[in-house]
Amino acid sequence: TWSGPSDHSSAVAFSWDSESLYIGLVVTDDTHQNGGSGWNGDSVQMVFANAAQDTVTHLYNYGLSEAGDLVIMNEKGPGGTEASITRDEDTTTTLYELKFPAASLGLEAFETGMSIGVGVCVNDGDTEEGQGGQKGWSGWGPYAAVYGKTASATGLVTLVGEAPGGDLTLSDEDMTYDAQGATIVLDGDASDWSDLEFKSQIPFEKGGELVLSLIHI
């Protein structure tokens, strides 16, 4: 039974370069429950679809068992992904860092303007009796994984931005968000974010680079 954001909530961030797509998640969860599964318990299921969002192309699942073992399940795809999952019991947060090389998604490289259907399902289980396994979920386009593997339920990710360098200026016209279609487009040069003021969402820091957290659920 979900009792509020401290019970289970998640934030998702995307970044990319020509070689890989990177997805980071910060999950707030009062208890961590996973018996060694990539989906049944606290875990993340990734669904990838083509740009038309009518065909599921790849499925990858990730989990951290209660014994501390990393679980990577290549449900559909060649594998080759990388994952780091860490649990902090003091702050009741779990950090997922996922790397998808182009070949793991059947691509030669990632390019500006490329669109990919992506579903991120963050599963939740609890340690109370009868609450283990997949008892709830959050994420971005989670129903792409929960109710069968459904391409049309993914969100459309469009790769934009240039290599770091120059100045970044944002206005209301630069960013558009279509909630119904889950389409996010950001125009501008991805450069130094450190001096920008973020009023509603906190940057997700990875490898010394700041990445705007586009989705916060």
Segments the model singles out, each with a brief description of its role:
Residues T1-I215:
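Structural preference for beta-rich elements and adjacent junctions enriched in aromatics
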